[in-house]
């Protein structure tokens, strides 16, 4: 089956697609920060949807409020990880901006892999979260160490955490690129009539 969404400009077609993707991963394909998902002048927002997967019905809900942690519920039961949503609702989002994967820098390609792997592998999503958390702690330590030199004694702990979670991230990204090369290579050969070979390196 195919559903086609039509409407005038600024009626919310893209917002609807963004909402579906957000309910599948708790990651927005457009917004850089969750606060951008809340309407201007408002302090909170929520989104919910019914989904049918694994021969049963699911109710997916996410609530955001300024200054508070988001709430994710599956069938009214709170869950901690956004990756739990992808076990129920999988989504692939494609838009014209995806062409920037080729034209933009490495950051755009890393985000592409992060968005895909966070849906495919819960362990990757956890490692990515752990890495960012350790990085933020380390940044604060370095920033405040001039006033509190003893903070530098805690750096090795966060270096270790970043190394451990970073190793998991690198492992999954490398495997992802191997599979991407395999499947994208087949599609590229068909598009080029067998005259070109696509290469993917990480």
Where are these regions (language model features)?
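An accessory alpha-helical subdomain
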Residues: 100-194, 198-201
């Amino acid at each position: 089956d195919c559903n086609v969404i039509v409407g005038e400009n600024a009626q919310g077609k893209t917002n609807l697609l963004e909402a579906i993707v957000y309910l599948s991963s708790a990651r927005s394909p457009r917004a850089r920060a969750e606060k951008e998902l809340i309407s201007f002048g408002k302090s909170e927002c929520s989104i919910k949807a019914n989904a049918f997967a694994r021969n049963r019905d699911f109710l997916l809900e996410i609530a955001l409020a300024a200054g508070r942690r988001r709430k994710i519920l599956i069938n009214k039961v709170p869950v901690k990880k956004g990756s739990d949503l992808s076990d129920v609702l999988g989504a692939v989002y494609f838009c014209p901006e995806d062409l920037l994967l080729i034209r933009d820098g490495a950051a755009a390609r890393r985000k592409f892999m992060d968005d895909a792997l966070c849906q495919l592998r819960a362990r990757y999503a956890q490692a990515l979260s752990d890495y960012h958390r350790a990085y933020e702690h380390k940044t604060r330590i370095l920033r405040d160490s001039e006033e509190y030199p003893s903070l530098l004694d805690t750096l090795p702990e966060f270096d270790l955490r970043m190394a451990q979670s970073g190793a998991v991230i690198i492992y999954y990204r490398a495997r992802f690129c191997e599979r991407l090369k395999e499947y994208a290579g087949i599609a590229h050969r068909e598009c080029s009539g067998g005259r070109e070979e696509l290469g993917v390196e990480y």
